[in-house]
């Protein structure tokens, strides 16, 4: 059994419709100009011949059936079916090596070694990503990601407005419209044909397996995540409930997981929902669990998955859990446990969570990891030059070093070892000190009388190793201390925010929106952070306000509104709009329920009511009561903080329009 750490988020979304929305993430520009290796024509031909002869035996259990592969990968509604047959086809798995050919002129190259290495790659993956098309995607990645972000926001906005009317993929396609669906699939087809994405999405486990692709896309992870987000979102239009692309993305997320966090638990819950939807129809026959897993991945076998997987896949026995889930569901198909809108919200939440997880960061501090850092690369090159130059010194220079071979020559002061474990200096300076120490040690080792210096060199080499270990330990302790300070600071901020509310139940509802006084902070930083700064300043000024003559002194602390007060606020806004001072004046004259409130309090309550309707996708219901609610503004920071899609403020109603509505 596998221990899922945190699966409550996706489960709540699947059980409650329309509660999860997503935020738009800003994609940053990044470039990558790293050269990649290529293989020769002879190796390509050898691998093709081997793949053709062994494909029948090695891949018979893992390829999709002929009858299933003859169907289109993506099915649309009736009004766009002809377009699907003409432009969209299921991706055909290619067993050939589509790589750029280049004649190798390097001396002493062993062709047998290259052939065996490529044979090993052919045993892991079904189709090699064309390196030329991958390089083309590197150049266009940012533009493609921006276009994908726009299409995602457009589709999500339509779903947010019409979530009640969308009950299946067909109705979703109808809401989008024929032209929109056609544009989405043409854009997805371009990713396949132009950039070589034969499996209709991005596989981060594949990129991590091969250093050539990792070097290409190391700085382009966010744009790639945006492209993957788009491919997963349009797969929701698949009315066959197969959802091949979504299964691919979920399995790739599990394969590339390195740390045991709560994210992979959400992935397992979503995969179970996809399996239930796949086997929930009568038209889907029983299928082998291994074949079901491999049908949506570019890998040849389950053993190949153990080669490309991360730490979580093996430690948590993900493969066994997936096979047991597939077997139980295929033997006794369960009834769909979630409606289609809840399923869409769960998919969007999962894709958003996956965008925030880094998969292409090199976390190791080994020499291999430092090779990708420009400053470290210069230090290592200088170190190699010094070591190679010192070993080729003449006998005269060696004799000169011999005369200086004393205990002071190898002292920690001379070698600079007393400064290496200083955590205040940078890594580049530390590597420079190590380079200088090794330069002196190797120079002394080139002398003729090695018997006198080898023992000393060994001793101080041991001292150098201890200094490096001491530095690593000091840096680890320093990082842990900084992390503890950060956690303590966050705890203080949370306690300060919690103290602003008198009742625990009102914390989430009565969070104040951004006021005009916070505009300057909002321009310089994030609006959410500006809101928190405003709360802290408000708490600091609370003592001063008590000493002033405030007419609403008795209702300084927040309290829960009664139904009578909320109904009165609805009536006042319907009659008088957003004239808050006028509403308070009328309430005082008529001795109404809102007579004790101030203009700011009723304005905040009106914003909170509208935000609640926005979160539940019920704005049209609110506008049906009164069009004056369109003039109630909800700040962008409040929407970002509570994950509500931000809608621009509607211009005030014209006088003639208001008169016609009231009449």
Swiss-Prot record:
The modification Phosphoserine is found at residue 332. Residues 489-498, 512-524 have a biased composition (Basic and acidic residues). Keywords: Chromosome, Cytoplasm, DNA-binding, Nucleus, Phosphoprotein, Repeat, Telomere. The keyword Repeat applies. GO terms for molecular function: double-stranded telomeric DNA binding; molecular adaptor activity; protein homodimerization activity; telomeric DNA binding. The keyword Transmembrane does not apply. Pfam families: Myb_DNA-binding, TAZ1_RBM, TRF. It is found in: Cytoplasm; Nucleus; Chromosome, Telomere. This is Telomere length regulator taz1. Its main location: cytoplasm. One of its GO terms (cellular component) is chromosome, telomeric repeat region. It comes from Schizosaccharomyces pombe (strain 972 / ATCC 24843). Regulates telomere length and function. Required for the repression of telomere-adjacent gene expression and for normal meiosis or sporulation. It may be a negative regulator of the telomere-replicating enzyme, telomerase, or may protect against activation of telomerase-independent pathways of telomere elongation. It may be involved in the interactions between chromosomes and spindle proteins, disruption of these interactions would lead to defective meiosis. Residues 15-72, 389-412, 471-554 are annotated as: Disordered. Residues 27-43, 54-67 have a biased composition (Polar residues). Interacts with taf1 via the Myb domain, and ccq1. InterPro entries: Homeodomain-like_sf, SANT/Myb, Telomere_rpt-bd_fac_dimer_dom. GO terms for biological process: meiotic attachment of telomere to nuclear envelope; meiotic attachment of telomeric heterochromatin to spindle pole body; mitotic telomere tethering at nuclear periphery; protection from non-homologous end joining at telomere; telomere capping; telomere maintenance. Residues 556-612 form the Myb-like domain.
